[in-house]
Design a protein with these regions (language model features):
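Flexible glycine/proline-rich, aromatic-decorated loop/lid segments
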Residues: 1-30
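Long, contiguous, secondary-structure-rich segments that constitute the structural scaffold
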Residues: 33-88, 161-176, 181-270
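Short strand-coil-strand connectors
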Residues: 26, 109, 197-201
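Short, well-ordered loop/turn elements at secondary-structure boundaries
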Residues: 1-2, 101-102, 109, 138-141, ...
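Long, low-complexity segments enriched in small/aliphatic residues
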Residues: 67-166
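Pocket-edge structural micro-motifs
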Residues: 8, 32, 108-110, 116-117, ...
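Structural motif
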Residues: 4, 142-144, 175, 217-218
Length: 270
């Protein structure tokens, strides 16, 4: 649970960093602010700048959103301008027209897909990706936690949509998945309740026993366990997978190590 909730503006209340978008031809787009933020809400980049200032790191963020977008416009080419994007919201990227059947251009110095990164090397990391064994090894008593999006949901953004909430309930989409072999080790049958616990926390979930998951893993969807009563359709449905995930990141990329978590499983009532 968060110690602080910061008043981030909605997507209609803040302009965005420009970015490429998929289309019949390559374009760059920028979302322009439609209305002023409500109350004390601020854009994310303003919140980050304010936090940096409070931490004595304001000099590291001594620029505005337009400065970032202007630099990106220069990188895309002379025909992409900030004024133009403020006016139209999108524009084509010169030299990036691609039609079906054409050989795509790779935007690297060599024109090829690189398998080594000089930027990683500058950061003191291996220039070429190196395999590393997982930090945890699942066994018959502690499978590995995995999670991943369900096709009809988008994170928790859509969990409160009435039709999707009803569909998720009808499908019992909130269930944790176990392979029959793994479930048998714990004396668990399809539909049983089980307690899942890690070094970080524990949750109580209904189990789906299915061959669609590896015996070494237990799956929990990331969309449920919403606690906010304001999300009336989603509140109280399923469990929050992040209650089981410790705070850890991969050294090279900073990605969260979500799948490096062994899980203890106990059938409720056993």
């Amino acid at each position: 649970k968060a110690d602080y909730v910061l008043p981030a503006a909605t997507y209609l209340e803040a302009s965005s960093v420009i970015a490429p978008a998929a289309a019949e031809w390559s374009i760059v787009e920028m979302r322009n602010k439609a209305v002023e933020p409500a109350g004390e809400a601020r854009s994310v980049h303003e919140i980050i700048k304010d936090i940096a200032q409070a931490c004595g790191k304001g000099d590291d963020f001594d620029f505005e959103l337009d400065d970032v977008n202007s630099a990106l416009c220069e990188a895309y080419g002379s025909s992409v301008t900030l004024a133009g994007l403020h006016d139209t919201g999108c524009t084509s990227i010169p030299g990036c027209d691609v039609k079906a059947g054409d050989e795509p251009a790779i935007a690297t110095e060599s024109g090829k897909i690189p398998f080594a990164s000089s930027e990683f090397e500058k950061a003191g990391l291996s220039k070429v990706p190196q395999y590393a064994d997982p930090t945890v090894a699942p066994n018959d008593h502690m499978p590995r936690l995995i999670t991943g999006a369900q096709s009809f949901q988008t994170r928790t953004y859509t969990a409160d949509a009435p039709k999707l909430a009803a569909y998720a309930s009808d499908m019992a989409a909130q269930r944790a998945w176990l392979n029959p072999q793994t479930a048998a080790n714990f004396g668990i049958a399809d539909g049983d309740e089980a307690e899942l616990s890690t070094s970080t926390g524990k949750v109580r979930a209904t189990i789906r026993v299915t061959e669609l998951i590896n015996p070494e893993a237990v799956y929990l969807p990331p969309h449920y366990g919403v606690e906010s009563k304001a999300m009336a359709q989603a509140a109280g449905f399923g469990v929050r997978v992040w209650n089981l995930v410790p705070r850890a990141s991969e050294q090279a990329t900073g990605a969260g190590m979500v799948c490096e978590v062994p899980v203890e499983i106990r059938k409720v009532g056993a």
